[in-house]
């Protein structure tokens, strides 16, 4: 027999309304014990909530949803009372006294909904993403994922792959047919169509991933180059202390900002130099740790100091120490001191933004550059939120499609193409949970709130 679970569905603490949710075969028994009756399905009933001895603990609205017409697909009872934590704890304690009822694990209601085919895995993840959204655009995109926009695109890809697999395997199973299915051009055309279709989904998923997770941008450079001033300019407030004393910033400072809906984690670091002060040396060590973990580096140069702004010197002292795959934007700061105009240029393969963090002249150029460099497009309609695991699955599927194309066009190997298509189908199906390990499910749902 399936277990019956209970948890507080609203956030802990004081509030106007507090909700307890019960899901499982004993939901009607809980209703009888607490309410004295089971409400009619999907009909709100205003009733007292009673303790075991008949004492009224609270009064409020009771809602009953009969299986399978509920969020979890099981019998569900919701008790909506006052939001005082003491009252809710008393009611929860009373429900847990009933035999066969236990406290729900984090995310267990959503997990039951997934296991009962009420929503797929991408939709279940979207519940947590909607709750955690930090911007209006992220919230709208999470809602679209919850409504199945992302899953629909993935399922369309899976259907296309299954159709092509069937066609390829038919050509393998009937080799004596006069028509050479592998050579008639239809399979290659379909395969290239799937590759293009997947590339469109990957592009949209990348934007969705930026919306969900943000991008980590580290501001680095020599002491007194204006790193903290730039952090303040981007944040729109005095987030960091700014002085003329080199080495003022000795630890890592973090700010979370949005540029037209794109979330950025901006990190200001200690100035990079050979320091003798132990505290400053620790700060510089932490700065290099942050640099190695960044999605992009903003390298600050002092344009008023010719030696500091010498790109050839910067290349040997700093750029040569970075991973070759780490994107770098060079910012020439303090143009207000030498009368330069704000501008964007390119030199030695690096984008260079000339600006003044003090007067904010050119800061808008940097904001636009960061948006473009991160591949973020403002105002895209119909977007969805995506997680890192989704991007990984899409990337692996794309790799195996390309391998399959080579097997077809260069080696005419139908069996090997069929195997690559099987792997593509498997990776895509992981996104929606059609092929998913128990460990992955545990990791996903354990990150949810209790009561969700």
UniProtKB/Swiss-Prot annotation:
GO terms for cellular component: cytosol. (6S)-5-formyl-5,6,7,8-tetrahydrofolate binds at residues 21, 78, 118, 452. SUPFAM superfamilies: P-loop containing nucleoside triphosphate hydrolases (SSF52540), TrmE connector domain (SSF116878). InterPro entries: G_TrmE, GTP-bd, GTP-bd_TrmE_N, GTPase_MnmE, MnmE_dom2, MnmE_helical, P-loop_NTPase, Small_GTP-bd. Belongs to the TRAFAC class TrmE-Era-EngA-EngB-Septin-like GTPase superfamily. TrmE GTPase family. Homodimer. Heterotetramer of two MnmE and two MnmG subunits. This is tRNA modification GTPase MnmE.
């Amino acid at each position: 027999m399936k277990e019956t679970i209970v948890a507080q569905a609203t956030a802990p603490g004081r509030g106007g309304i507090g909700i307890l949710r019960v899901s499982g075969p004993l939901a009607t028994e809980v209703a009888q014990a607490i309410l004295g009756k089971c409400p009619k399905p999907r009909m709100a009933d205003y009733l007292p909530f009673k303790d075991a001895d008949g004492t009224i603990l609270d009064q409020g609205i009771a809602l009953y949803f009969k299986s399978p017409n509920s969020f979890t697909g099981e019998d569900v009872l919701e008790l909506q009372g006052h939001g005082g934590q003491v009252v809710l704890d008393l009611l929860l304690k009373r429900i847990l006294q009933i035999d066969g009822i236990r406290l729900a694990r984090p995310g267990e209601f959503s997990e039951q909904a997934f296991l009962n085919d009420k929503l797929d895995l991408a939709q279940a993840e979207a519940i947590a993403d909607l709750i955690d959204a930090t911007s209006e655009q992220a919230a709208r995109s999470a809602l679209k994922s919850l409504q199945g926009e992302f899953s629909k695109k993935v399922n369309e890809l899976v259907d296309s792959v299954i159709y092509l697999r069937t066609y390829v395997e038919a050509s393998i199973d009937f080799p004596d047919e006069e028509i050479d299915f592998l050579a008639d051009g239809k399979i290659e055309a379909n395969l290239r169509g799937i590759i293009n279709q997947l590339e469109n989904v990957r592009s949209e998923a990348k934007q969705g991933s930026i919306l969900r997770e943000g991008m980590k941008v580290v501001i680095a450079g020599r002491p007194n180059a204006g790193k903290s001033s730039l952090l303040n300019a981007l944040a729109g407030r005095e987030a960091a202390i700014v002085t003329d004393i080199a080495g003022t910033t000795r630890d890592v400072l973090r700010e979370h900002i949005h540029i037209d809906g794109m979330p950025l984690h901006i990190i200001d670091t200690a100035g990079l130099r050979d320091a003798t002060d132990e505290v400053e040396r620790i700060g510089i060590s932490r700065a290099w740790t942050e640099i190695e973990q960044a999605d992009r580096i903003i390298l600050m140069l002092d344009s008023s100091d010719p030696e500091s702004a010498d790109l050839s010197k910067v290349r040997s002292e700093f750029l040569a120490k970075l991973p070759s795959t780490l994107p770098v934007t060079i910012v020439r700061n303090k143009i207000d001191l030498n009368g330069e105009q704000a501008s964007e240029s390119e030199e030695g393969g690096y984008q260079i933004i000339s600006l003044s963090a003090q007067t904010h002249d050119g800061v808008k150029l940097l904001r636009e550059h960061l948006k473009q460099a991160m591949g973020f497009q403002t105002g895209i309609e119909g977007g969805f939120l995506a997680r890192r695991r989704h991007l990984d699955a899409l990337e692996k599927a794309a790799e195996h499609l390309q391998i399959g194309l080579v097997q077809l066009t260069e080696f005419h190997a139908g069996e090997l193409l069929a195997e690559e298509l099987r792997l593509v189908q498997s990776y895509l199906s992981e996104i929606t949970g059609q092929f998913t390990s128990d460990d992955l499910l545990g990791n996903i749902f354990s990150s949810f709130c209790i009561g969700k």
